[in-house]
Amino acid sequence: MGNQHRIFVSSCASGAEGAIIAFDLDAETGRLEQVNRYDDIEGPFYLALAPDRAHLYSTHAPSGFEGGDGMVAAFAIDSESGALRKLNEQSAAGTTTCYVDVDPTGKALVFANYSSGSVGAFPIGADGSLGEMSSFVQH
């Protein structure tokens, strides 16, 4: 892509407004072009791109940010179109899941739950999917 960079933005909204949108950014001109939109997700919030740039992870709140457990979803990214394909999702066992990051090896994902005051981790499989929660700390 040379001076083109693929970026992903979450809308942090529910219903028809809830989406993760893929853009191509032209670094020379600063022009953004929407290339894809994934809207089968409620309340997408924080995003993390895996080091392989082939997988994206999103926190989201299917029950709204103040009710029910937050979730972390795993997606495969189509490198040509920017389309997302959901691999799986796991409960974050807390409310307002507000942070997510992938370790530099791409083998683990960490998250934080703001309202319920907890952090945890999931292993990441070879296919990019999330395994069962491997660590959880309640503060």
Spans of features found by a protein language model:
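Short loop/turn segments immediately following beta-strands, especially the blade-tip
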Residues: 22-30, 75-82, 121-132
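Residue-level detector of Asp-centered blade-edge/turn motifs that repeat once per structural unit
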Residues: 2-3, 49-53, 102-106
